[in-house]
Amino acid sequence: MFNQRKVNISFDDGFRDIYTNAFPIFKKYNIPFTIYLTTDFPDGEADLWWIQLEKHSFSEKDFEDKLKLIFDSGRPMAEEMHRLTKTAIDYDICINEALSWNEIKEMIESGLCTIGSHTVSHSGLTRISDEECRRELFLSKERIENELLVKVEHFSYPHSMMNANVQSVVMGSGYKTAVLGYGGKVRVGDDMFGLKRKYIIQD
């Protein structure tokens, strides 16, 4: 079993194109997959500032430069996006880009989709207090389990922000595994709360 190479396909956040683009292919070829869900997405509360930043950037470099300024600013990300683009969050865009709970339920009912947690609000856990970290972990898990009637045992660190303290909180929050967004292959004996992935984006 362990001599065979295996691939696990997973998505973070909860964008609707998982349902519209990827799910039909997974159904056709019977491919299992995991969604690490940020519960603000289907709840209609997510401020998808990076999508709106793309719409207000004139080039890939402009987008990347603005993105770096946002991450380096230390201010709330949506607030900094607003400052850079002079544009308020458009929640209609956010809702249209996000999965709905009904779409998630349909994917679960296919028998192919496993749901994990990716916090409530996609906060970088190393940048918030221990109390806020626990809230993000417990409330997202609870929300998913109550809405979808599934057990949530897997977690993905937003922005891959993880340290020993955050990892300890995750381990004490009822999860069995936690993944980063990068790092490469997973091998036998790897830390189950620091599992690596290969990050794939569209060209």
Predicted regions and their residues:
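Active-site beta->alpha N-cap acidic-glycine motif
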Residues: 1-109
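C-terminal active-site subregion of NodB/CE4 polysaccharide deacetylases
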Residues: 1-10, 16-19, 48, 110, ...
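Residues that flank catalytic or metal-binding motifs in active/ligand-binding sites
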Residues: 31, 121, 191
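Residue-level detector of anion-binding/catalytic polar loops
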Residues: 32, 114, 176
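Short beta-strand segments
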Residues: 37, 116-119, 154-159
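Feature marks short, surface-exposed loop/turn motifs that line or immediately flank catalytic pockets
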Residues: 41-43, 123, 158-161
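Histidine/lysine/aspartate-rich catalytic loop segments that bind and position anionic ligands
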Residues: 99-104, 108-132
